[in-house]
Amino acid sequence: MEGQDFEEIKTIASLAMRLQNLCEGFDETNKNAIISAKFKVLLELSKKDKLSPAEIKQNLGLAKSNVSNLCGRLVEDGEIAKSKEKFDNRTIFYSITPLGEAELADMLDKMQKNFKTELEYKNNFPKIVKSARELADLVK
């Protein structure tokens, strides 16, 4: 692979990883992996009135133990509520609380700002490359 092509592929791969990280709620200042799963659970619960742990597990592809631990923490934090089925106390459901809705809105706002920054970077990338090449030519 030629030098310029290789550099462009590296750049595209780098941008793809950064966008994927943004989509997953990854934040460079807080590398806590729970953010991604928390965001996904809150987003799923915002779409429905309530979901069972099995539905959350199926929708998000998380392990049963991870769903249990994560939802337990979100209940403790007041971001989701746990309720039991009226006719069968063994069946539980989770629903998003107003605090959870506010947290999700904040996460979505941050994600939107991050997307805007990334898109501005992507749109300006050709100008950045051109300027870097001109600077390299001056230094030679």
Protein language model regions, located:
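N-terminal leader segment of winged-helix/HTH proteins
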Residues: 1-32
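Charged, amphipathic alpha-helical coiled-coil/dimerization segments
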Residues: 73-130
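Short, flexible helix-adjacent loops and helix caps
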Residues: 24-31, 85, 116-119, 140
